[in-house]
Curated annotation (Swiss-Prot):
Its main location: mitochondrion. Keywords: ATP-binding, Mitochondrion, Nucleotide-binding, Stress response, Transit peptide. The gene is HSP1. Residues 666-675 have a biased composition (Acidic residues). It comes from Pisum sativum (Garden pea). Residues 1-52 form a transit peptide. It is found in: Mitochondrion. GO terms for cellular component: mitochondrion. InterPro entries: ATPase_NBD, Chaperone_DnaK, Heat_shock_70_CS, HSP70_C_sf, HSP70_peptide-bd_sf, Hsp_70_fam. Residues 649-661 have a biased composition (Gly residues). This is Heat shock 70 kDa protein, mitochondrial.
Length: 675
């Protein structure tokens, strides 16, 4: 193979510390964090037996879903609110309590700056990324620069990585599965958009680790949907059109004899329902400004109300031709309160979002071209993601592929079900299915002149391994820098940098003479390992790619501890609510008994009961569960004296020797309710 000249590096004296700054996996004896520490990590107070189930999780931008195999079929699990999907929303209230899912979404209007949604769009992204800067203008919460240059978010004055926010959602999902299965869960298959790059896949895996999950496999969302569609012996060439809350993917797969082979994939990781909501939001803000001369964009509370109204209107217009957006008291000026009342037709909505829908066409055409097939070769088009319920989207899909899309899968649940099927394959429970996925973007290195030299082209089936020999760019060069890139542009600077490392100790020689073998290895998760080896000395340097951002093991360890702390606080808060509910029920029963028997018991007994109830009420206003429990026990003990005094019979006064005939009064009508 003709040696290609590596980009020239300025020669410098390397100390051993600068070499060790790169993560070298060779010679490392450190046990994998995920398999050693976190595989067994569950909530420290869980009394459930350990399970071996591998759950399937669709960690979505807007909503998330969890499924588990029951026999040969995947089953979607309902959460504690009785819903089959959970909003991917995390909030911190004024007491810094963590809320996840529906409770977090419900309070967003009154707490917009501390309610975090759509953070999947930031996962694995740099703060300076153009898409991050665009997102900053659209959300009410703060997006901040992390010490490593990544995009993080801020709530209640504390900074969180998007992986951490994803971990809070994953923990809620994990608990949903544990409550259903009655055992602890430590293994999962988690889905990602097919067009996620290496940094985004790594960050998703980190989210699983923080949540105490050993992520057995990262699987592409369209592929997972095809798995759930094809599990019932469906065959043919399938196109999966996946338009979700934050991302768009299209994949072409061939299903034959239980083998699911991805032919090509394409997409846009910044196109989804959030953008449709934002387009409608901008329209509502401009309309109100036109009619009332008030700019609602400066009012975060009003914006959050508008955002929720926009999402509701978008959903309604999928089944009706027009809807009313009615928000009373949205603002006020010197003349008084102002109300927003707009009638929105489906055609107007379609006009507002037409440019977004048009953006799905180019990836579909590229995908067909990469798969080397024509439209007529496609047997079925599957719709995945909530946004595919929009009639205009369905119309455009029909135009692109020349046929009406299939309604063969549930757009909200198919991805999680496919992930559960992949979990069944990994466990060995599902033997008749085989999945062959692809890498969505080309991988290579920067060579002399800033050129991007590909080693692995996009849509290569994974896992895969590819090597190529390079050489030095200068005489007597004793080290080379390997800069790893991902993308489709010809110049290195225009592609996504995944990381870089140095190969040192090359014997001095004329330029072009040393033989340096660079090897790319992509695993089944789509995660990249790169090695460089000097063929003359056998010296090798190897890294699992981490971008200059990303989370270190120490940061993940710290976030795991924070997650445990939040879990403990959640448990303590639940215990406090339970004991308050118990106390409330007991007070009702005690007061009922006291009212019924007050005339038949001594005044000092009645006073003792009243004082005990008063003390219990005072304790209930506090935050100390142990104090409430003690006061509840005291109140129950006090009210038990009613039974003792009534056991003397209907004659009235207390009697030393128990009942002397007559009807014995029952024990006081109180009960302690355990919830």
């Amino acid at each position: 193979m003709a040696a290609t000249l590596l980009r020239s590096l300025q020669r410098r004296n390397l100390s051993s510390s600068s070499v060790s700054a790169f993560r070298s996996l060779t010679g490392s004896t450190k046990t994998s964090y995920a398999t050693h520490k976190l595989a067994s990590l569950t909530r420290p107070f869980s009394s459930r037996p350990a399970g071996n189930d591998v759950i399937g999780i669709d960690l979505g931008t807007t909503n998330s879903c969890v499924s588990v195999m029951e026999g040969k079929n995947p089953k979607v699990i309902e959460n504690s609110e009785g819903a089959r999907t959970t909003p991917s929303v995390v909030a911190f209230n004024q007491k810094s309590e963590l809320l996840v899912g529906t409770p977090a979404k419900r309070q967003a209007v009154t707490n917009p700056t501390n309610t975090l949604f759509g953070t999947k769009r930031l996962i694995g992204r740099r703060f300076d990324d153009a898409q991050t800067q665009k997102e900053m203008k659209m959300v009410p919460y703060k997006i901040v620069r992390a010490p490593n240059g990544d995009a993080w978010v801020e709530a209640n004055g504390q900074q969180y990585s998007p992986s951490q926010i994803g971990a809070f959602v994953l923990t809620k999902i994990k608990e949903t599965a544990e409550a259903y299965l009655g055992k602890t869960i430590s293994k999962a298959v988690v889905t990602v958009p097919a067009y996620f790059n290496d940094a985004q896949r790594q960050a998703t895996k980190d989210a699983g680790r923080i949540a105490g999950l050993d992520v057995q496999r990262i699987i592409n969302e369209p592929t997972a949907a095809a798995l759930s569609y094809g599990m019932n012996n469906k065959e043919g060439l399938i196109a999966v059109f996946d338009l979700g809350g934050g991302t768009f993917d299209v994949s072409i797969l061939e299903i034959s004899n239980g083998v699911f082979e991805v032919k090509a994939t394409n997409g846009d990781t910044f196109l989804g329902g959030e953008d449709f909501d934002n387009a409608l939001l901008d329209f509502l803000v401009s309309e109100f400004k036109r009619t009332e001369s008030i700019d609602l964009a400066k009012d975060k509370l009003a914006l959050q109300r508008l955002r929720e109204a926009a999402e509701k209107a978008k959903i309604e217009l999928s089944s009706t031709s027009q809807t009313e957006i009615n928000l009373p008291f949205i603002s006020a000026d010197a003349s008084g309160a102002k109300h927003l009342n707009i009638t929105l037709t489906r055609s107007k909505f379609e006009a507002l979002v037409n440019n977004l829908i048009e953006r799905t066409k180019a990836p579909c055409k590229s995908c067909l071209k990469d798969a080397n097939i024509s439209i007529k070769d496609v047997d079925e088009v599957l719709l995945v993601g909530g946004m595919t319920r929009v009639p205009k989207v369905q119309q455009v899909v029909s135009e692109i592929f020349g046929k009406s899309p299939s309604k063969g899968v549930n757009p909200d649940e198919a991805v999680a079900m496919g992930a559960a099927l992949q979990g069944g394959i990994l466990r060995g429970d599902v033997k008749e299915l085989l999945l062959l996925d692809v890498t969505p973007l080309s991988l290579g290195i920067e060579t002399l002149g800033g050129i991007f030299t590909r080693l692995i082209s996009r849509n290569t089936t994974i896992p895969t391994k590819k090597s190529q020999v390079f050489s030095t760019a200068a005489d007597n060069q004793t080290q080379v820098g390997i800069k790893v890139l991902q993308g489709e542009r010809e110049m290195a600077a225009d592609n996504k940098s995944l990381g870089e490392f140095d190969l040192v100790g090359i014997p001095p020689a004329p330029r072009g003479l040393p033989q340096i073998e660079v090897t790319f290895d992509i695993d089944a998760n789509g995660i990249v390992t790169v090695s460089a080896k000097d063929k003359s000395t056998g010296k090798e340097q190897q890294i699992t790619i981490r971008s200059s951002g990303g989370l270190s093991d120490d940061e993940i360890d710290k976030m795991v501890k924070e997650a445990e702390l939040h879990a403990q606080r959640d448990q303590e808060r639940k215990a406090l609510i339970d004991i308050r509910n118990s106390a409330d029920t007991s007070i009702y029963s005690i007061e009922k008994s006291l009212a019924e028997y007050r005339e038949k018991i001594p005044a000092e007994v009645a006073k003792e009961i009243e004082d005990a109830v008063s003390d219990l009420r005072t304790a209930m206003a506090g935050e100390n569960a142990d104090d409430i429990k003690a006061k509840l026990d005291a109140a129950n003990k006090a009210v038990s004296k009613i039974g003792q005094h009534m056991s003397g019979g209907s004659s009235g006064g207390p009697s030393e020797g128990g009942s002397q005939g007559g009807e014995q009064a029952p024990e006081a009508e109180y009960e302690e309710v355990k919830k």
